[in-house]
Amino acid sequence: MIHQQDYTAYQTYALLDFNISFEKDVPADDISRAVIEVTERIDINKFVDFTHRNSHGYDGLMMLRLLLLAFADNGYASTRKLAELCRTDIRYMFIAQNQKPSHQAFQRFIHDDLIMSVEDIFYEMNRIMEDELPIDTDVLCIDGTKYEANANKNTFIWRKNTVRHRERQWKKCNDTIKRINKFFKEKNINCRYSILREPNIDYLLRVTDKIEIYMKDNGIEFVHGKGCRKSDIQKLYDELAKEAMKLFEYALHFDMLGDRNSCSKTDPDATFMHMKYDYYNHTNVFKPGYNVQVGVSDGFIRNIYVSSDCSDIQTYIPFMEKYKLMYGKLPLKTPADAGYGSYDNYMYCRENGIELFMKYPGYYEESKKTNDKNRFRASHFERTEDGGYICPAGHEFEVDKVTTDTRGIYARNNIKLINHHCDGCPFRSRCTKSRIGRSINYCKELDEFHKEARKNIT
């Protein structure tokens, strides 16, 4: 049997410093290494202010790299998400060298030390890469997509509903004012308020102020609560004040809408628009969202524009103006789908020396071979030398009227053609349902733009 004596051991312990490195774990073509390489070539003083940083703070270059990696990899990352990535993602551990900045450290860095916004840094990086890499900036491919906003889908505001409800509310206000006039007339008081046609909140507030003065002069007190009987004038006062507040709410809705037809109460910048349809749950049809436009050159994202417009047509010119503001020039070619092919966009390209590479509505329909199904479409009609149309029966359309449309950015001349030979035509039932005959609206300048775009694309 082995016996062990009790004793106290005096022994020094030396802790070994294990510095874990992820140098071999991060691939050579990973985006984190690209961020490190780009930040090594730039003047970091343009982005980070080192003048008031404490000696015990995190390295400003490291924090900038972590921030750029998060936005390049995820598009957006909150400060808490950044702190979580530094604890769980080896790419962030590789840049941070196993340091774990808290979300407060990232917040202080963004608020106190970061000179430029993330968007300005994005464009500055693009300028640097344009000088370092062979990027063909003459061609900018444009496309857009819709992102759902972080807003409840039941917080909608519709312009038509707001207009209708405001009109009804104003009628109630006028009825209340008539009852107020009747009240003063019965009291033999020479006081009469006008009935306005258009809603005017200031006018209603002046009326309520006058009623308050009347009640104060006559010793009538405002009473509220259970068991209190309101006077007749107070009832009228409460009704008018409630209706005025409702009109004020509608005025706020119009300010939130701007020139749009819908918006969200919790996110006024978001517009209700059609999303991609979910064929499994039958959802995502109409929700608040944003229209995000992206321009790419040689695989590099050169420009981003976030819009509240539901369609892509109205986003093209603001998108290009932002590109010109950031880079000082415009690309020579902007290939895009048919959602961008409009008269205003083509005119903008013509004025700024941009070649027409945008498709237009009906582009694929025109490329189809003429058959018995599509022969009655205007795009498959024969054309005359001066741009007129000839119907399948061989009759030429005549000019009915010429109008000028000034609703867009550029004025355009629209020509309405009408065919007076539809009576007795054997194709009439398949060609038109109009009583006066088949009519076509077209613009000569837009037709020329379509021909040029079709030639450039093919």
Predicted regions and their residues:
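Anion-binding and metal-coordination hotspots
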Residues: 9, 56, 67, 75-88, ...
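Hydrophobic alpha-helical membrane-insertion signals
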Residues: 1-32
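Basic, short loop/linker segments at the boundary and entry of helix-turn-helix/winged-helix-like folds
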Residues: 26-71, 442-444
